[in-house]
């Protein structure tokens, strides 16, 4: 018995049997050990043969394995186990019988199937099969069928891995047609595939198209048509096998093993005489698959059979991979006929979604509204870039269904958030109880109040949730019961059991329908749980994927949008024209009436330095995203050379940094809903503006890697100082403001090309700030200082006289508002810093800033009795206290420190 004359599979089985015997402490290696090793191989031919011999019973191999394990336990064992485990006489006889069968077959190596035939003649193995309820004669017959009608020979050490190669390395799509999703449309593509398959030679279609357009679905549609008989007679009885290239390559550790597997597949296809069609998804993998030194790739094994028409093969690949791999091999390409699968239109996608609706409803246990399917197709086409219909629309529906299912099976988000907040406050409550300082005691009172309010809010919500959950669970149970009864009804109708049919149809089923209708009619308004997937759920998923707010506007959103201009004015002093232009553009976009193929708004802001051009862009980003840092800021002074355009859109192929993408395109691709600020735009090279033309016109830009970036949900703001000197001259009275504005526009038209200016929504000229407006700016800057002081528990009070001093010492009409900030930082913040370090200012005190007696300096006074938190009452004061020169008016800034952090009050600052 020379192991070199055994196949790899046989040797592996003998080694595994030896390990089983050693671990069990058995003195000899018996046929039982060998059968146990072969039965443990889940994909082995013994399990296949037993399953088929018992009429396709999947549990029969496991039953046999249990019987063999029981028999092994009865064998005598030694402890400690013996050093060597020799083969028993019975096993040697089995191998000799197998070798004699091998010689009759003409095999060069002893294969596993011959070894099994030898094992079946052993009485102990036959008894085990009988005990498991399997006929040994049938198992023998199934093993002999494995090699096919012609009795294929094993001529190499890996020859026995290729029995039933199609079953091992592929799956029959015709067999699985009932489990596949229904294919809607694609009739023209399926007909073209059928026509190509019916040719005499080169009868191999290749489906090419973008990822996600439904190439594989065309083949699944063909499989379903074959099952229905809706194909020409030459395709009626064919098997459509999807070849798994990964399984073919996986585990092929010996040279030539991959080619041997593939040849076995092709031989089975050839023997089927046209009754097998291969489907290879990602067919470009065939080119180069298995190629190593001294071996050929899979494509060269396919070519002869493809050309002669002996092999009918359907391929599928994307346009890019077809061009990259297949077109390079002209001999391989000419054997295939191209079938282009185009992206379906939105109406076609809606039809596809309607066809898939039942499958997704059944899987998730939810109900999908038809309007949700329409919205999924429309929103995915409009907002999700870089992917294709119907794939992205199907994914939207799937995720929306999954969200609803998860919400049904878990606590509503509202209750969950309140529970988390309650736990957080309880932890804070326990921590503050141990503190003795004034601020902690004041905060403790506040935490107790918040906890009481939270518990009052949480209790009714929890009760409502439990009631709704019970109702939905009851409806689901009734529906499952109805499905079971309908199945029983169909069975009774087939058996012609009319009494049972009448009993079910007019008794049990009617009762269940009445119960379901009653429970569904109990649904009130403002439900916490919903088992319906509607347009809102789809829009929510789109918003989560893209960051674009496409959800239906809530009451808070409506109030925010209507008051957007007022809230921008709280931060930007003056400039009513610019603020209203930006606010109106955002309003149009969020109402859904903006132009669909252009950015939300595109503006050119003109005016002298320090009047609020950049500040307005930051304020808009803060209002839209609650964070002014979510602003895509491009400083155009960095783009003064022609080659710097590549930094915006990404370096072209072959240049350093090609893989990194552009500074503008990458940020917008990640956050399509953003405010883009091109600062100091007149300083950029003219070539930069050429790239912006298509952004302003079509809302799209192609980056250095050929990807289209969507700018349709961005607000584009350009700022420039062109002609600022004319506006300043108009302000001091040398010209009228109208003449100054005309001069600015002339300057702009000289510098920028007409095609750029013509694409902008609005060119807004910012006026220089008046003395009164600069006072408001000074107050805003002092408010910023007050915020920093409030973090240390210090309140700040500033008189109007102090603001007048600040203005008189810092005002410069040429530079606008920026000198005020510089002066406050240099004088006021420096003085306050000195007072903090010298411990003149302490926690819970108020700093009063007033004009000094000689009017060109500021006077500072500290009151230790005030501060943010009154030590006696525990009440909080405003962080910036306005002290006018005349009678006291209301607070200028209704802002308070909450949890020792600054929380902006919604009312903001009262305008004078």
Swiss-Prot record:
- SMART domains reported for this sequence: AAA (SM00382), ClpB_D2-small (SM01086)
Which intervals of the chain are annotated as region Repeat 1? 6-75
Instruction: List residues binding ATP.
Output: 209-216, 607-614
Record's GO cellular component, any one?
cytoplasm
What is the superkingdom listed in this entry's lineage?
A: Eukaryota
**UniProt keyword list:** ATP-binding, Chaperone, Coiled coil, Cytoplasm, Nucleotide-binding, Nucleus, Repeat, Stress response
Reply yes or no: does the keyword Signal apply: no
Chief subcellular location equals cytoplasm
Checking InterPro entries in the record gives:
AAA+_ATPase (IPR003593), ATPase_AAA_core (IPR003959), Clp_ATPase_C (IPR019489), Clp_N_dom_sf (IPR036628), Clp_R_dom (IPR004176), ClpA/B (IPR001270), ClpA/B_CS1 (IPR018368), ClpA/B_CS2 (IPR028299)
**Region described as I:** 166-412
Per its UniProt record, what PANTHER family does this chain match? ATP-DEPENDENT CLP PROTEASE, CHAPERONE PROTEIN CLPB1
State the family named in the UniProt similarity comment for this chain.
Belongs to the ClpA/ClpB family.
What is this protein's record name? Chaperone protein ClpB1
Natural source organism: Oryza sativa subsp. japonica
Lineage of producing organism: Eukaryota, Viridiplantae, Streptophyta, Embryophyta, Tracheophyta
Q: Which gene encodes it?
A: CLPB1
